[in-house]
Amino acid sequence: MLILTRRVGETLMIGDEVTVTVLGVKGNQVRIGVNAPKEVSVHREEIYMRIQAEKVPGQPNF
């Protein structure tokens, strides 16, 4: 796992098209903004896990 330190307002790049910006920090919560192309899905982990659990085997991924 790559570990990075960023301050509020600073951005990191994932590939050429995805940016993640630290918007704010309050207590133990960090607000981030993700800018990605429409074809790139962005989910919180708990939502992603629910989506994966609900997939029907053999169903195409769109």
Curated annotation (Swiss-Prot):
GO terms for biological process: mRNA catabolic process; negative regulation of translational initiation; positive regulation of translational initiation; regulation of carbohydrate metabolic process. The keyword Lipoprotein does not apply. It comes from the Bacteria. GO terms for cellular component: cytosol. The keyword RNA-binding applies. It is found in: Cytoplasm. Keywords: Activator, Cytoplasm, Repressor, RNA-binding, Translation regulation. GO terms for molecular function: mRNA 5'-UTR binding. SUPFAM superfamilies: CsrA-like (SSF117130). Pfam families: CsrA. Signal peptide: none annotated. InterPro entries: CsrA, CsrA_sf. Its main location: cytoplasm. Homodimer; the beta-strands of each monomer intercalate to form a hydrophobic core, while the alpha-helices form wings that extend away from the core. Belongs to the CsrA/RsmA family. A key translational regulator that binds mRNA to regulate translation initiation and/or mRNA stability. Mediates global changes in gene expression, shifting from rapid growth to stress survival by linking envelope stress, the stringent response and the catabolite repression systems. Usually binds in the 5'-UTR; binding at or near the Shine-Dalgarno sequence prevents ribosome-binding, repressing translation, binding elsewhere in the 5'-UTR can activate translation and/or stabilize the mRNA. Its function is antagonized by small RNA(s). This is Translational regulator CsrA. It comes from Aeromonas salmonicida (strain A449). The lineage of its organism: Bacteria, Pseudomonadati, Pseudomonadota, Gammaproteobacteria, Aeromonadales.
